[in-house]
Amino acid sequence: MNQFHTGGTAEIATSEKIGIRHLYISPGHNFFGHYGGPPDHHPIVEVPAIECVAGRGLRGDRFIDYKENYKGQITFFAWETYESICVHLSVWKRSPSVFRRNVITTGIDLTTWIGREFEIQGVHFRGTEECRPCYWMDLAFADGAEEYLKGRGGLRGVILTSGVLRVNV
C-alpha cells in the first residue's frame, strides 16, 4: 500500500511492499545508439547491490555521467510484466536481464510513478517517462516482445539522492 508524505514542496511516494528481485548494470551499450547496425556484446551483470549517485546514474553502469540531467539515469522493470510476457510469448528460458533494465521490482505499478518523486530503500528518484520498448526487444527476447511491451516497458528515472539499493526478495 502506498503512503504519501510531503517533504518540502514535493510529494514523495513510498511503499514498504516494493520488492527488488534483481539488479543489473552494464559497462557498455549493446542496442542504444546502434539503430540500423548490429548490436554490441557488452555483458549485463547481475549484482546484489547498486550504488545510486544523485544526478549522475549508477556506479559501474553505461549511463553514469551520460549527459547532464539525463532522464534515464536508472531504469525499472516490473517482475509481473516479465512473468506475463513469458506466458504470452511462451518463452521460459530468458532472463529478465535481456530487457537491459537496472532494477526489477515487484509489488508496484511503475506507470504510477511517471512524473512523480518516489523513494525505495531510502533513495529518492523521480520517474521521468515510460522506458519504451524498441525493435531490439524482438531480437533480445522473442518475436512480438516489442509490441507486447508497449505501455509496460518499465520506467526511466533520475536519481535525486545518493544511496544503495539491495535485492530483498
Where are these regions (language model features)?
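Glycine-rich active-site loops that engage anionic ligands at enzyme catalytic sites
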Residues: 105-161
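Electropositive, beta-rich accessory/interaction domains or terminal extensions
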Residues: 1-120, 129
